Amino acid sequence: GSLYLDDLKKLVDKTVCLIAFPHASNIIGQVNPVKAICSLAKEAGAFTCVDGVSYAPHGIPQINDFSPDIYLFSSYKTFGPHLGVMYVSDSLATELESQCHYFNQEFPNKRFTPAGPDHAQVAALGGIYDYYDSLSNHHLNSELSSSSCFDKLNNLISNQEKKLLKPLLDFLKTKKDIRLLGSYEIED
């Protein structure tokens, strides 16, 4: 459901080690204030783990902007292969115990892959980039090359979803026998 930053502030102190939360609710679709939660956690000395599985199909997660310690999503929900994707910040990765063979411990990209990568699945991840690059070429007349391009694509996707969602919400408002979890209003 909905996460409220003011409620979280009351719970976070120096004893909190990890704040794990969804980027977006899988139930009501509300996008949570990821950047603010990550900032609050850092102030308290806690790590963050953001579950992006419900958000990633609706936009490109701006991991550099949010600064989470861990960000996870399923690539099959973003036009990719059936594969889990995990980002781990360099600062956290150096603190975690290596899960690989001893001779790979010094390689950040190998530390958490004990059996080695599934090369076919990893190669198929390139299709996600191709999809977004095609969107960028078609709608923005530019190649996928910068964070501003990602921002424009996020806006493009979001605006299309809002356009499709508004008539549905307007219709549901007229139905007295339906209870909507979440808001009838489309938030930015």
What is the meaning of each model-derived region?
Residues 1-188:
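Pyridoxal 5′-phosphate
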